[in-house]
């Protein structure tokens, strides 16, 4: 356990950030899953709507530093490619 006041503060800050990042990552996974489920169901309209909803969430996670910007770009690219297979 930390003895210094500053170390105790950093522990609290880390816990807060971890919880916030966990929430963002969970939301991100949910939106990606919705796109994949729509594609699996071969529902083009639902897949496009799900993709349109997922892209801002992915970009938001990247801007908050939860995922790397390259990871976000790759995810958006792959999901878009997946949705375009239905058209």
From Swiss-Prot:
InterPro entries: Ribosomal_bS20, Ribosomal_bS20_sf. Binds directly to 16S ribosomal RNA. Belongs to the bacterial ribosomal protein bS20 family. GO terms for molecular function: small ribosomal subunit rRNA binding; structural constituent of ribosome. Residues 1-11 have a biased composition (Basic residues). It holds the Pfam family Ribosomal_S20p. This is Small ribosomal subunit protein bS20. GO terms for cellular component: cytosol; small ribosomal subunit. GO terms for biological process: translation. The keyword Transferase does not apply. SUPFAM superfamilies: Ribosomal protein S20. Keywords: Ribonucleoprotein, Ribosomal protein, RNA-binding, rRNA-binding. Residues 1-23 are annotated as: Disordered.
């Amino acid at each position: 356990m930390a003895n210094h006041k500053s170390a105790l503060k950093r522990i609290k800050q880390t816990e807060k950030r971890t919880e916030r990042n966990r929430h963002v990552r969970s939301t991100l996974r949910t939106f990606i899953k919705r796109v994949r489920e729509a594609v699996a169901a071969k529902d083009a309209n639902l897949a496009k709507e799900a993709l349109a909803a997922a892209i801002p969430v992915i970009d938001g996670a990247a801007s908050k530093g939860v995922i790397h910007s390259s990871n976000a770009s790759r995810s958006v690219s792959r999901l878009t490619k997946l949705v375009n297979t239905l058209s």
